[in-house]
């Protein structure tokens, strides 16, 4: 289940993408339009900046804009940055693999086989859905 933090990050980034991405968008505008708590949004945007997804600009014309084109930022990039690995169990994680303590044999574990399929299908959908798709409501059914 996505955390509120991820949902807010997605909403903020989709909003920024919809503005065209040229001029920085003030945090006050993002917070007001998306009805997000400003202080929480500041923390989220700092994480997104540190993760290379947005750039920040100070001053009167300051705010946030995407660090790269919307078509090059996937839903998967955002969720991994905020949540961590997509895998539901550590033994199928690509980036945070850890053997399950209660597993006798990974190669024959039926739970692992199902979780691999879940991970692969989830990653395929999220990694192939960009902010450009979401900002234009072009998500495939």
Model-found features: residue ranges?
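Short amphipathic alpha-helical interface segments
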Residues: 9-21
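A short alpha-helical element within helix-turn-helix/winged-helix DNA-binding domains
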Residues: 28-34
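Basic amphipathic alpha-helical segments that dock to polyanions
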Residues: 44-49
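Non-DNA-binding regulatory cores of transcription-related proteins
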Residues: 67-141
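Beta-hairpin "wing" of winged helix-turn-helix
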Residues: 52-67
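Residue cluster at the C-terminal edge of the helix-turn-helix DNA-binding motif
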Residues: 50-53, 81
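Key DNA-contact positions within bacterial/archaeal DNA-binding proteins
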Residues: 39
